[in-house]
Amino acid sequence: MNVAASFRIEPLTGNHDRSQFLSGSASLDRYFREQASQDTKRRVTTCFVAVDIETDTVAGFYTLSACGVPLNDLPPGLAKKLPHYPAVPAALLGRLAVDRTCQGKGLGGVLLGDALVRTARAELGVFAMVVDAKDEAAQRFYERFGFTLLPGEARRLCLPIATALQGAAGTSNPARITPKQARNIGK
């Protein structure tokens, strides 16, 4: 089954019913139901939802916002390739959750791939995507997709955008990524 074809991913609006969403993480569920729309309105973050195309129910979500990563927090091999600014621009994947009814089917990877493509296509300089894994299982999930731990940071991982795109789509130019290639990011 092609998981990506079963869902449309779109920005969160007031039309999305969040009341029944249950991921198994009380803090993520509470955030999604009570805070996500306020953060989006305040432009603190942008929230995207995966909506089941048959039932129109929300099956997952993620948030993106801007952040900076101190240059000396990056692995030395990465840091030496960058300008010697105090920090490099990054996108923070703040939250990612999948409803229990859809867990284990690959939707988390599809959401991650969508976040990477949206970040790469943004018309601003972003070197990497950064995530703060909430636990060891989340850390392993991100590591499967190429994220690496930042030295000295507990569960903060990063993935250079160009690396993600090159590995999944065969190009580091997001404008050249086809919809089919975009679905492969996160697989």
Language model: regions and residue ranges:
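Short amphipathic alpha-helix that is part of the acyltransferase structural core
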Residues: 1-38, 42
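Conserved beta-hairpin
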Residues: 43-66, 76
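Conserved acyl-donor/pantetheine-binding loop and adjacent beta-alpha core of acyl/acetyltransferases
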Residues: 61-95
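Active-site/acyl-donor-binding loops of N-acyltransferases
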Residues: 148, 153-164
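Conserved acetyl-CoA pyrophosphate-binding loop and the N-cap/start of the following alpha-helix
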Residues: 102-114
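Intrinsically disordered, low-complexity and often Lys/Arg-enriched segments
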Residues: 1-6, 168-187
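Conserved beta-strand-loop-alpha-helix junction that forms the acyl-donor binding cleft
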Residues: 99, 120, 126-139, 158-162
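Conserved active-site alpha-helix within GNAT-family acetyltransferase domains
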Residues: 109, 117, 125-126, 133-152
